[in-house]
Amino acid sequence: MFQDNPLLAQLKQQIHDSKEQVEGVVKSTDKAYGFLECDKKTYFIAPPSMKKVMHGDKIKATIEKQGDKEQAEPESLIEPMLTRFIAKVRFNKDKKLQVLVDHPNINQPIGAQQAKSVKEELQEGDWVVANLKTHPLRDDRFFYATINQFICRAEDELAPWWVTLARHEQSRYPVRGAEPYEMLDQKTRENLTALHFVTIDSESTMDMDDALYIEPIAQNSTQTGWKLVVAIADPTAYIALDSQIEQEAKQRCFTNYLPGFNIPMLPRELSDELCSLIANETRPALVCYIETDLAGNITAKPNFVSAYVQSKAKLAYNKVSDYLEQADNAWQPEMPEIAQQIHWLHQFTKARIQWRKTHSLFFKEKPDYTFVLAENGKVQEIKAEYRRIANQIVEEAMIIANICAAQFLHEQAKTGIFNTHSGFDKKFLENAHNFLMANLANEQNQTELAERYSVENLATLNGYCQMRHDIEPIESDYLELRLRRYLTFAEFKSELAPHFGLGLEGYATWTSPIRKYSDMVNHRLIKAVLAKQPYEKPQNDVLARLQEARRQNRLVERDIADWLYCRYLADKVASNAEFEAEVQDVMRAGLRVQLLENGASLFIPAATLHNNKEEIQLNPDELALYIKGDRTYKIGDIVKVKLTEVKEATRSIVGEILQ
């Protein structure tokens, strides 16, 4: 009798409308219940209600009150956690197809169907890409997904690569070529094949895009400086602006350097053969002449030319470094001309390093961690590799060449793709000032430092560099790591702007056009200026894509590395191996540390640091943990740790600090 009673329906609606409504994000637990995290409060979600939602869903909920207890009742979906996602295939006891989401906080199986476009016969554990089709809060149906793409079999040793690339929607294949290739750039080129250019790179490198030649500048038989000639491969000589290769390069933006192999931005026959500055092969190049005095100051405007060059030798970083460091049984140059080039480049590099330490910024050296892999992708070892003198020779030549390109593009083209960094985020300038004063000021220098580290001064390139030079000699990384959190991100811009991170007025890369799309764009601009041809300012969508691609590539590299670290360290738990580590982050939940030996990232739960969580306080300004009122751990601290758990399924490594 009450079934269709409009008064009753109205009453129910009024009761519902009178209840408090909130918006928040669902957080699951390892139990059946969960929580709704709102701006100022967290609400309990009971197990039956958790079946309607998923960890990470943004939802609307009503608050049900029973006595003094409150709990959230999910009402509607604002934004689902899952749309496109990575998953593993499973079959339930009735042999029904399901997927398990590859996410540490989502463990409920989701029913699934296989799209017709997926031809593989799916097996338990296969990796796939799926899309969520129905959601209980949105569609009044249970969770259901469609499998749209097969990635690889469960037992595929290269799963870390294929799964990660699929997650970030990146291709595992090089760009398809367009043979035969024709030289489109028919304008006259200078013939510089007689100059004794050399390339210095890793032994395994195929895509060599730079070669160097140097000679002293003398007046009245006395050396007064250096003439450095930087030759850069010229792929735009073969790639038309309206070609498919150009469009693909514009989308990829970078060659993706992954543990074990790379995925080139250009077709391999261009990057590794036709454009690569292979020894004793004549290649088209864009060349820059740079003159400096003996102290490394640039003394003339850079001179760019289109040319043909011929590298006379491919040299390996480690061999050149061994030779210059006079290591036992070191490699020796095959020809006196090569030895002469190495020694001159070495002298030039020492001058430029000193110039940068004085006039710009030079970073404390940190190692690169390299995975040594077997054919099947198994990690054999992880090496911490420091930049040696041969690496610095190439680095200094590229940096000065990029400084010159920024100057040339700014003056001649009035545009380009410039690498910029504006230092401290404006909203954190006050924090940076306060932090520096708290850590460096005393009674004697208080007034001087208040001016030196004023907000106005820190916002300028000179003031920022001055501050960096002040903290450079300090042994600990604490100041550097803490200040880093106040910085903005580096940006690509189409007009000249400073690069605070390098301490330079302008910086525009053009030295890796085989590997970076921004460098291809700058090549085209430089060549257009030289040929007096029209050109266009780089579009904002190109700059935005470069920014996004750089971010994606870093995530891909990090995700693969995290997976490989888990595989490598899994059997080290039982042996109780001890490692030195640097504290990288400090949170209420614990510490994030990096093993110095191999670069792996570990989580140290706060519960293992002290048995009474009420006595642990986080100081977010200092990025430090206080235990019983004493500052016990801060970022930059070196601690001794051991591994306690490695979970490959969630790519997480847990450890504890050894007291």
Swiss-Prot record:
Q: Which GO terms describe its molecular function?
A: exoribonuclease II activity; RNA binding
PROSITE patterns named among the record's database cross-references:
RIBONUCLEASE_II, S1
* Nucleus among keywords: no
Please give the InterPro entries that the UniProt record associates with this protein: CSD, NA-bd_OB-fold, RNase_B_OB_dom, RNase_II, RNase_II/R, RNase_II/R_CS, RNase_II/RNase_R, RNR_Ribonuclease
EC annotation? 3.1.13.1
Q: What class of enzyme is it?
A: hydrolase
Q: Which HAMAP family match?
A: RNase_II (MF_01036)
The similarity annotation says:
Belongs to the RNR ribonuclease family. RNase II subfamily.
This protein's name: Exoribonuclease 2
Species name for this entry? Haemophilus influenzae (strain PittGG)
